Amino acid sequence: MKKWICMLLAAMMVLSLAACGGNQDPQQENGTQQGDTQQNEQTVDLKQAAEDAIATLGDEMPLFPVEDAAELEGLYPGLTAVETKQIVAYQPPVSGFGCELVMVEVASAADVETVRGILQQRVDSMANDTGYPENTPAWKNNSAVTVNGNYVVMGVLPEGVTLPAAFKAEF
């Protein structure tokens, strides 16, 4: 359980550091600007960040990638219609288990709220799912949808693992 918290905190830290990267002033040499003014954008490889975080769980809590667009659309209706730079989703091998990780980098800041709403709808619907009542506490009490710049992350922890207050406050 502690490994899961560490995984989520590591993923959130990577995203927060990426959001801190901003525009840099154009480099100057001999008092003149070189080239066009470019914005240096920092980005996070969400797939690698998620895989690194999931690796810390070991065999205790396996999560597998969801890569099929139709499956993504079935789980998160409307998500595939949003223009994204990156999207990774991980689920356990057993349906209904209260443990998921979704990380999205949207192409436009205007889409952040749309993605946040889609992921929050997933949390809300699973929290009220009568098909898997044993997992309801995880969705009600141990889930978070966070936004940091153009990144939106949804994490759900198994029952018995609580989100640290610092984690909730940061995201």
What would you call each of these model-derived segments?
Residues 94, 135-171:
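A short, solvent-exposed beta-edge/loop patch
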Residues 6, 21-74:
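N-terminal, intrinsically disordered, polar/charged segments of Gram-positive cell-envelope systems
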Residues 15-19:
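C-terminal motif of bacterial Sec signal peptides marking the signal peptidase cleavage site
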Residues 63-98, 110-111:
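Short, compositionally biased low-complexity segments enriched in polar/charged residues
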Residues 1-4:
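Positively charged n-region of N-terminal signal peptides that target proteins for export
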Residues 47-54, 112, 116-120, 164, ...:
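Extracytoplasmic/secreted envelope proteins and their assembly/folding machinery
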Residues 100-108, 151-155:
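Second-shell loop/turn segments in exported
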Residues 109-149:
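Short Gly/Thr-rich strand-loop-strand
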